[in-house]
């Protein structure tokens, strides 16, 4: 019975893709994410899709080549590889973007959106050229990160992950409730 219901839901989502977005929204809300963060995350998914569409048009292969280019972008903006970043946050198989703060997510989007725009202008023809473009796009966001850190006096990248963000949200809600009593 359960399997049939899940199958029906997926068929309905194929007919009406908005249902998929609504399901994702409900899932993120249940995990304790704020609506603001969820909106950023959904936008990040769109930015990533535009980047991978651009890579597809340049002949970049899904899988290993996507991973190498993503690593170049991440390294250029965050100062660490994707694996190092996941290790910092204590992640194994979890999605790194789902465990980023709003600012980390925005900088990652800036890196990916910039990479997409540079690629459209430079028209890279080889994997090596795509790799250089990925590094350039990441560097733009890396410069923004360094500027933010200089102005705020604190690091943008933290070890906090989704569990920490959920706990923070719960604490804020509890404190607000306690104050209202």
Give, region by region, the residue ranges found by the protein language model:
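Positively charged, phosphate-engaging catalytic surfaces used for nucleic-acid and nucleotide handling
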Residues: 1-181
């Amino acid at each position: 019975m359960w399997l049939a219901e899940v199958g029906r839901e997926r068929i309905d989502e194929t007919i009406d893709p908005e249902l998929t977005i609504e399901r994702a929204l409900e899932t993120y809300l249940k995990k304790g994410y704020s609506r603001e963060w969820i909106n950023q995350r959904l936008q990040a998914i769109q930015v990533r899709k535009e980047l991978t569409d651009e890579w597809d048009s340049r002949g970049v292969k899904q899988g290993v080549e996507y991973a190498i280019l993503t690593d170049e972008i991440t390294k250029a903006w965050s100062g660490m590889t994707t694996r190092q970043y996941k290790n910092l946050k204590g992640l194994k198989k979890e999605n790194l973007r789902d465990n980023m703060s709003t600012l980390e997510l925005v900088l990652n989007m800036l890196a990916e959106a910039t990479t997409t725009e540079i690629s459209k202008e430079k028209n890279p023809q080889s994997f090596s050229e795509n790799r250089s473009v990925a590094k350039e796009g990441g560097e733009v966001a890396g410069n923004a990160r360094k500027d933010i850190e200089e102005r705020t006096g604190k690091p943008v990248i933290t070890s906090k992950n989704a569990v920490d963000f959920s706990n923070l949200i719960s604490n804020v809600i509890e404190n607000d409730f306690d104050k209202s009593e």
